[in-house]
């Protein structure tokens, strides 16, 4: 599909991830394929698992999970499928979100705007693209960062944003993308992100996925992600979109 018009209703909606796509940690943790090795991440995951088990999730179901999003989603699915009341579900999710939120704050305290983020967003805006943001970060984190001068107030470019606080299930589940599509009233979109969870959510929601390779993935890892295109920075995105 080729979109050359500057009418935003004839161009795909462009959705962005935040961490690793628009901003990044100044001192990047070591990543091997899709897993990130960082001491604090392990501690957070252990805390999340302990909370899940405390609320009745079998330890054998969560102990093998090595991603925070997987722990979150599995716990949510378990309590929903086992007849927990809505009030109890909210308690479980709130408690599991406490260490998640602590990790948000720690990561963002040492994050910075990626080069070319603002120039790339401005170029897309001038060409008439409608843009939105879908992140696994909390609403508090997104609102603080996206409106801060140190991060270029990049939130000004997005009419809509969806964070984990508005969702039952988070990426790699497609729910966050489905929610923003419903808000905007669109079903044609391109999602720009840096992880396997971004790729999986985008494909599951029926969109195109553009990998921004800020993690320096090798060729084999990129193939596993199965992106529709690969860019190194956001200034390359508009040209890439012209080829869809």
Where are these regions (language model features)?
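Histidine/lysine/aspartate-rich catalytic loop segments that bind and position anionic ligands
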Residues: 135-171
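Short, acidic loop-to-helix structural element flanking the phosphoryl-transfer center
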Residues: 105-133, 143, 174
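Conserved Lys-Pro-Asp/Glu-containing loop-to-beta segment of HAD-superfamily phosphomonoesterases
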Residues: 9-10, 170-199
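Metal-dependent phosphoesterase signature
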Residues: 76-119
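Acidic, Mg2+-coordinating phosphoryl-transfer loop and its flanking beta/alpha structural elements
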Residues: 190-229
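Short acidic-hydrophobic, aromatic-tinged amphipathic segments that line or gate anion-handling sites
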Residues: 229-236
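Active-site neighborhood of HAD-like aspartate-dependent phosphohydrolases
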Residues: 2-64
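Surface-exposed amphipathic alpha-helices with a cationic face
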Residues: 121-125, 181, 199-203
């Amino acid at each position: 599909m080729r979109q050359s018009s500057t009418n935003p209703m004839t161009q795909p909606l462009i959705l962005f991830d935040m961490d690793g796509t628009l901003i990044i940690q100044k001192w990047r943790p070591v990543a091997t394929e899709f897993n990130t090795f960082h001491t604090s991440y392990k501690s957070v995951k252990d805390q999340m698992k302990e909370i899940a088990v405390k609320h009745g999730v079998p330890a054998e179901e969560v102990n093998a999970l090595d991603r925070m999003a997987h722990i979150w989603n599995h716990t949510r699915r378990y309590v929903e499928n086992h007849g927990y009341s809505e009030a109890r579900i909210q308690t479980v999710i709130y408690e599991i979100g406490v260490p998640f939120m602590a990790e948000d704050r720690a990561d963002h305290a040492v994050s910075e705007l990626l080069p070319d983020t603002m120039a790339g967003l401005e170029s897309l805006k001038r060409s008439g693209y409608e843009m939105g943001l879908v992140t696994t970060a909390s609403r508090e984190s997104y609102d603080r960062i996206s409106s801060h001068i140190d991060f270029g107030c990049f939130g000004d470019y997005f009419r809509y944003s969806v964070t984990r606080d508005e969702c039952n299930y988070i990426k790699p589940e497609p729910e966050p993308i489905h929610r923003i599509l419903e808000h905007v009233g669109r079903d044609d979109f391109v999602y720009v992100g840096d992880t396997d969870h971004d790729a999986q959510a985008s494909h599951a929601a029926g969109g195109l996925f553009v990998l921004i390779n800020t993690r320096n993935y090798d060729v084999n890892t990129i193939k596993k992600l199965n992106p529709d295109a690969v860019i190194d920075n956001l200034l390359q995105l508009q040209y890439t979109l012209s080829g869809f």
